[in-house]
Amino acid sequence: MPQLDTSTWFITIISSMITLFILFQLKVSSQTFPLAPSPKSLTTMKVKTPWELKWTKIYLPHSLPQQ
């Protein structure tokens, strides 16, 4: 049975990889990509919730007077 000649495999694989890389670069460079989105200034309206309209004081245990 004859032995398989692998002496040309290296140059074949390298040249096909280079060819695929060049074709991919040409394909990507021909595409048109959209521009980066411009930032939009958003003005948020502060909505008062019912618990913010009422004044409440929370007494912590440390702030209570000594008994």
Curated annotation (Swiss-Prot):
Topological type in the membrane: Single-pass membrane protein
Biological process annotations from GO: proton motive force-driven ATP synthesis
Protein location: Mitochondrion membrane
Keywords: Acetylation, ATP synthesis, CF(0), Hydrogen ion transport, Ion transport, Membrane, Mitochondrion, Transmembrane, Transmembrane helix, Transport
Record bears the keyword Transmembrane: yes
GO molecular function list: proton transmembrane transporter activity
Modified-residue entries (N6-succinyllysine), positions: 54
PTM annotation (N6-acetyllysine): residues: 54, 57
Highest taxon of source: Eukaryota
Gene Ontology CC: mitochondrial membrane; mitochondrion; proton-transporting ATP synthase complex
InterPro entries named in the record: ATP8_mammal, ATP8_metazoa
Transmembrane segments: 8-24
Family to which this protein belongs: Belongs to the ATPase protein 8 family.
Function (record text): Subunit 8, of the mitochondrial membrane ATP synthase complex (F(1)F(0) ATP synthase or Complex V) that produces ATP from ADP in the presence of a proton gradient across the membrane which is generated by electron transport complexes of the respiratory chain. ATP synthase complex consist of a soluble F(1) head domain - the catalytic core - and a membrane F(1) domain - the membrane proton channel. These two domains are linked by a central stalk rotating inside the F(1) region and a stationary peripheral stalk.
Quaternary organization: Component of the ATP synthase complex composed at least of ATP5F1A/subunit alpha, ATP5F1B/subunit beta, ATP5MC1/subunit c (homooctomer), MT-ATP6/subunit a, MT-ATP8/subunit 8, ATP5ME/subunit e, ATP5MF/subunit f, ATP5MG/subunit g, ATP5MK/subunit k, ATP5MJ/subunit j, ATP5F1C/subunit gamma, ATP5F1D/subunit delta, ATP5F1E/subunit epsilon, ATP5PF/subunit F6, ATP5PB/subunit b, ATP5PD/subunit d, ATP5PO/subunit OSCP.
Name used for this protein in its record: ATP synthase F(0) complex subunit 8
